[in-house]
């Protein structure tokens, strides 16, 4: 009986571990030096949300960016003349949206 109870408890603890929210870095504006200008905090990506990192480059140089939790997030890179917008989404580990 104790063996079954131990297995049940182990299963519950493992399941709870998988249900924990994903912690992401949150910054409304990263400057060209990669420093957060709007007080870096964290956010919890729950309900299929992901950590997001958006970066803007001009003439190959990083200009500014955004970090946070988003419900709709797609990985893509868009190039327009000398500007490159890069959007990265992740959910594989906590704080995965650090540049």
UniProtKB/Swiss-Prot annotation:
<dbReference type="InterPro" id="IPR016054">
    <property type="entry name" value="LY6_UPA_recep-like"/>
</dbReference>
<comment type="similarity">
    <text>Belongs to the PATE family.</text>
</comment>
<feature type="domain" description="UPAR/Ly6">
    <location>
        <begin position="22"/>
        <end position="99"/>
    </location>
</feature>
<keyword id="KW-0964">Secreted</keyword>
<comment type="subunit">
    <text>Monomer.</text>
</comment>
<keyword id="KW-0732">Signal</keyword>
<keyword id="KW-0325">Glycoprotein</keyword>
<feature type="disulfide bond">
    <location>
        <begin position="73"/>
        <end position="89"/>
    </location>
</feature>
<feature type="disulfide bond">
    <location>
        <begin position="27"/>
        <end position="36"/>
    </location>
</feature>
<feature type="glycosylation site" description="N-linked (GlcNAc...) asparagine">
    <location>
        <position position="31"/>
    </location>
</feature>
<keyword id="KW-1015">Disulfide bond</keyword>
<feature type="signal peptide">
    <location>
        <begin position="1"/>
        <end position="21"/>
    </location>
</feature>
<dbReference type="Pfam" id="PF00021">
    <property type="entry name" value="UPAR_LY6"/>
</dbReference>
<feature type="disulfide bond">
    <location>
        <begin position="90"/>
        <end position="96"/>
    </location>
</feature>
<protein>
    <recommendedName>
        <fullName>Prostate and testis expressed protein 14</fullName>
    </recommendedName>
</protein>
<dbReference type="GO" id="GO:0005615">
    <property type="term" value="C:extracellular space"/>
</dbReference>
<feature type="disulfide bond">
    <location>
        <begin position="43"/>
        <end position="69"/>
    </location>
</feature>
<feature type="disulfide bond">
    <location>
        <begin position="24"/>
        <end position="51"/>
    </location>
</feature>
<feature type="glycosylation site" description="N-linked (GlcNAc...) asparagine">
    <location>
        <position position="75"/>
    </location>
</feature>
